[in-house]
């Protein structure tokens, strides 16, 4: 009985240490504690595509923070785009990473006149008017996106944070830019039946990889907010909770009542 109890205690302590967010020398997040327009304030059915300069312009006009997605082109340029292929947004079944920036500029977003913007163009447009929530895209151990993004942000004077599903990308910022606020994106990969091994998906769902990145906040799927690791990080260790993707005003209001922040789309939370 004594040995079993000790083993249980060790297991609980190990789990807590793996899941634990950053708890010391936390950076100031006060300028980031707002709600964010998911991929800008867009309407894909009304001529304002997601992750377009126009969607970001509308978010700035509304005073909303902006959540956006970053990837690298074949020639190493940082662009703003969510999917790994152009099929859904541009009608071409080709990987973004296989194209140069000049080649990407030959495509329009959803039959509009808008192009896939560079991160540099977005920074110039936003110019510190609203905070940025920057998702770093990438499913492998290649972290070359991180220094490229950091170089563009080096002279940017607006408020921003980075987030990713990939803890290895957050680890780069932990090791090289600990002053930058970083957040772990999480969903239930087991229930969503995403690709990858069971062990990988279990570890990411339970955020056992937080030991690599020690995030400052958790950006959690609206559908899976009751996960034990999410509650441990936010309610016990005090990490801030960002909730995505909030598509109903009633969920937005509940998050607000709970003191949580929303990454929203499809409605105006001020109306």
Show the residue positions of the predicted features.
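Phosphate-group recognition and catalysis centered on beta-loop-alpha active-site segments
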Residues: 1-271
């Amino acid at each position: 009985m004594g040995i079993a109890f000790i083993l249980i205690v060790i297991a609980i302590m190990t789990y807590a240490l793996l899941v634990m967010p950053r708890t010391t020398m936390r950076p100031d997040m006060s300028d980031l504690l707002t709600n964010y327009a998911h991929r800008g304030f867009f309407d894909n059915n009304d001529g304002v595509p997601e992750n377009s300069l126009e969607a970001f312009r509308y978010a700035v006009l509304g005073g909303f923070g902006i959540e956006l997605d970053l990837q690298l082109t074949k020639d190493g340029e940082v662009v703003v785009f969510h999917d790994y292929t152009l099929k859904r947004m541009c009608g071409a079944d080709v990987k973004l990473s296989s194209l140069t920036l000049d080649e990407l500029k030959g495509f329009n977003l959803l039959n509009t006149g808008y192009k896939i913007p560079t991160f540099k163009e977005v920074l110039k447009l936003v110019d510190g008017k609203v905070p940025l929530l920057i998702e770093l895209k990438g499913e492998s151990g290649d972290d070359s996106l991180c220094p490229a993004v950091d170089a563009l942000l080096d002279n940017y004077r607006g408020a921003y944070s980075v987030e990713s599903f990939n803890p290895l990308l957050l680890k780069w910022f932990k090791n090289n830019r600990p002053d930058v606020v970083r957040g772990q994106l999480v969903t239930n990969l087991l229930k969503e039946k995403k690709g990858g091994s069971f062990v990988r998906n279990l570890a990411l769902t339970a955020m056992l990889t937080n030991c690599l990145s020690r995030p400052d906040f958790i950006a959690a799927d609206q559908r899976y907010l009751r996960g034990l690791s999410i509650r441990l990080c936010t309610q016990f260790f005090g990490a801030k909770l960002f909730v995505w993707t909030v598509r109903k005003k009633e969920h937005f209001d509940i998050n607000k009542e709970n003191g949580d922040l929303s990454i929203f789309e499809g409605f105006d939370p001020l109306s």
